[in-house]
Swiss-Prot record:
Keyword Chaperone: no
Entry-linked PANTHER family: 39S RIBOSOMAL PROTEIN L10, MITOCHONDRIAL (PTHR11560)
Keywords: Ribonucleoprotein, Ribosomal protein, RNA-binding, rRNA-binding
InterPro entries, A to Z: Ribosomal_uL10 (IPR001790), Ribosomal_uL10-like_sf (IPR043141), Ribosomal_uL10_bac (IPR022973), Ribosomal_uL10_bac_type (IPR047865), Ribosomal_uL10_CS_bac (IPR002363)
Record GO terms (molecular function): large ribosomal subunit rRNA binding; structural constituent of ribosome
Main function: Forms part of the ribosomal stalk, playing a central role in the interaction of the ribosome with GTP-bound translation factors.
One Pfam family it belongs to: Ribosomal_L10
The protein's assembly and partners: Part of the ribosomal stalk of the 50S ribosomal subunit. The N-terminus interacts with L11 and the large rRNA to form the base of the stalk. The C-terminus forms an elongated spine to which L12 dimers bind in a sequential fashion forming a multimeric L10(L12)X complex.
SUPFAM superfamilies in the record: Ribosomal protein L10-like
Protein known as: Large ribosomal subunit protein uL10
Domain of life of the organism encoding this protein: Bacteria
Statement: the UniProt record of this protein carries the keyword Heme: no
Organism, as annotated: Chlamydia abortus (strain DSM 27085 / S26/3) (Chlamydophila abortus)
Length: 170
């Protein structure tokens, strides 16, 4: 193996070990402007996009001890390395993909030490985020409380109006 390839292999191995997860993508019709915009959007979620040679990537995966299905990796291969939250990175990829007419295809991924197929990564990306789940829980808890307050308020106003009517009769 040439020295350049060995350095590239070491670099990819380091990125795999430093990341919380990664997403394997096939990209179609990607211009330089799309690539730059995609990379910029990923930087907001502590992730980066790399275009890699398949052989180098799968060799790095093998040396890191990961086993990802490589049967459907025809075409150009891109990898999103997520250094903070792999789910947020997957959501960002999905949002970008919707914006640019499905120019990215999920092939596989590794999120929270679980190997996932492309469909599974896409399903994870469609799940609500922790922030959204917290907001939904707060909404579920707040709704009954506001109803109780409303019922108590109407009951109290009924008692007050009854007392008011009694005092006006006398």
């Amino acid at each position: 193996m040439k020295e350049e390839k060995k350095l590239l292999l070491r670099e990819v191995e380091e990125k795999i070990s430093a990341s919380q997860g990664f997403i394997l993508l096939r990209y179609l019709g990607f211009t330089a402007a799309h690539s730059r915009e995609f990379r910029n959007s990923l930087s907001g979620v502590s992730a980066e996009f790399e275009v890699l040679k398949k052989r180098i990537f799968f060799k790095a995966m093998q040396s890191a001890g990961f086993d990802i299905d490589s049967s459907d990796t025809s075409g150009h291969l891109g990898v999103v390395f997520a250094y903070d939250d792999a789910v947020s990175a997957a959501k960002q990829v999905l949002d970008f993909n919707k914006q640019y007419n499905d120019s990215l295809v999920f092939l596989a991924g590794r999120i929270d030490s679980a190997n996932l197929s492309g469909k599974e990564v896409e399903a994870v990306a469609k799940l609500p985020s922790m922030k959204e789940l917290r907001q939904q829980i707060v909404g579920l808890l707040a709704a009954p409380m506001s109803q109780v307050v409303g019922i108590m308020g109407s009951a109290l106003s009924g008692v007050i109006s009854c007392i008011d009517q009694k005092t006006q009769k006398n």
